[in-house]
């Protein structure tokens, strides 16, 4: 049985080998036939070419023989037809000659955009527009990929303020390396700094990150608040110190010349005939004038009363006992206010208003003329 099985296997193998041989032979025959057919086709083409050339040469020979042989006199009809043909051919040749392209000047309407402007002219033209108008013009006319937009992006990338970020909320143990590692995810960083305390050597809680491109800074600012080493950190675009809108200029303040005779506004007081050309505002000037009354030992140039609205106690509080007693100024002559030592302000102001007995240092209950006035005058004349 085993021998029969082996024989069957051998027979099957032989059959397979025969089939493969036949298939290979058939393929080889097909390849040979293709090659032979290609050769025949190439030969037939080569044979056709000389035949065509022979036909052409025969035609040329016939034409030459006709030209050499004397032609019989043509009939008048044929001569007319030949003349017409010659005329047509000459007309066609003339038309062909005239069909050459002729440059004709095209009339165009010139506009301002066709001229080439100077840089100064463009600058003057742009200065007439406001900032908002220029922004709207660029925003509407510029398209993605245009030269204008690319120039804007290039200038923004060159500007460090467009790529710099301010980070706050950092821990005291934050270092430059930690901050750089946290923000490298958004783009390449050119500079990174953490502000340190000189005394302790620890971080103050804020720092700066400068990206190489504006794209990285914008990616970092998409989410202003971030988690960094178990802390909430906030990011803001860093701006230079002098950037932004200019500070509003203060309105120019006129130099005010105030006279004591001016009673329209009792809150505005100054010494007569003195022009304060310091450019101070009215509130500051009022405070300065009141301090001049309270802190300077100046006579009032013959005026019997201080300016209206003046409280004599204000002079005592500001440290000038002389001004505190101005209610009794009419009883002295001019030039006597600056003579002799001064009494402390706590007593002088009270004596000027509330004089009731002869003791200068005491405080009385009544007002009017009496021994108190004489005591006060004696104190001034000491």
From Swiss-Prot:
The RRM domain is annotated at 163-248
The protein's GO terms of the molecular function aspect are: RNA binding
Q: Report whether Transmembrane shows up as a keyword of the record.
A: no
Q: Where is the composition biased (Basic residues)?
A: 10-22
Say yes or no: keyword RNA-binding present: yes
The record, for InterPro entries, names:
Nucleotide-bd_a/b_plait_sf, RBD_domain_sf, RNA-binding_reg, RRM_dom
Q: Which UniProt keywords apply?
A: Nucleus, RNA-binding
Location relative to the cell: Nucleus
Q: Where is the composition biased (Basic and acidic residues)?
A: 23-34
- Main localization, broad class: nucleus
Q: What protein am I looking at?
A: UBP1-associated proteins 1B
Q: Which organism is it from?
A: Arabidopsis thaliana
Q: Which gene encodes it?
A: UBA1B
């Amino acid at each position: 049985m085993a021998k029969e099985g082996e024989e069957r296997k051998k027979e099957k193998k032989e059959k397979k080998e025969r089939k493969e041989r036949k298939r290979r032979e058939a393929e080889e025959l097909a390849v040979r036939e293709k090659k032979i057919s290609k050769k025949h086709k190439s030969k037939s083409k080569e044979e056709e070419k000389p035949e065509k050339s022979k036909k052409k040469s025969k035609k040329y020979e016939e034409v030459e023989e006709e030209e050499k042989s004397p032609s019989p006199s043509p009939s008048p009809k044929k001569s007319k037809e030949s003349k017409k043909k010659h005329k047509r051919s000459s007309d066609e040749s003339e038309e062909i000659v005239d069909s050459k392209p002729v440059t004709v000047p095209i009339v165009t309407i010139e506009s301002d955009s066709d001229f080439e402007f100077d840089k100064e002219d463009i600058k003057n033209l742009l200065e007439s527009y406001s900032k908002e108008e220029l922004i709207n013009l660029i925003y509407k006319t510029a398209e993605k990929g245009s030269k204008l937009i690319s120039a804007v992006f290039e200038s923004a990338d060159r500007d460090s303020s467009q790529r710099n970020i301010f980070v706050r909320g950092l821990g005291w143990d934050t270092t430059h390396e930690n901050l750089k590692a946290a923000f490298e995810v958004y783009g390449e960083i050119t500079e990174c700094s953490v502000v340190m305390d000189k005394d302790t050597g620890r971080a103050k809680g804020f720092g700066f990150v400068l990206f190489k491109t504006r794209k990285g800074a914008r990616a970092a600012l998409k989410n202003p608040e971030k988690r960094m080493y178990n802390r909430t950190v906030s990011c803001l675009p860093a701006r230079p110190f002098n950037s932004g809108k200019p500070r509003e200029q203060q309105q120019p303040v006129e130099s005010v010349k105030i006279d004591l005779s001016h009673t329209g506004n009792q809150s505005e007081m100054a010494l007569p005939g003195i022009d304060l050309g310091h450019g101070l505002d009215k509130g500051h000037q009022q405070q300065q004038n009141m301090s001049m009354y309270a802190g300077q030992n100046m006579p009032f140039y013959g005026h019997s009363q201080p300016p209206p609205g003046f409280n004599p106690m204000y002079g005592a509080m500001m440290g000038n006992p002389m001004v505190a007693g101005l209610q009794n100024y009419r009883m002295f002559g001019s030039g006597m206010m600056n003579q002799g030592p001064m009494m402390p302000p706590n007593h002088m102001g009270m004596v000027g208003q509330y004089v009731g007995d002869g003791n200068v240092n005491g405080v009385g209950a009544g007002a009017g003329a009496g021994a108190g006035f004489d005591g006060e005058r004696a104190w001034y004349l000491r």
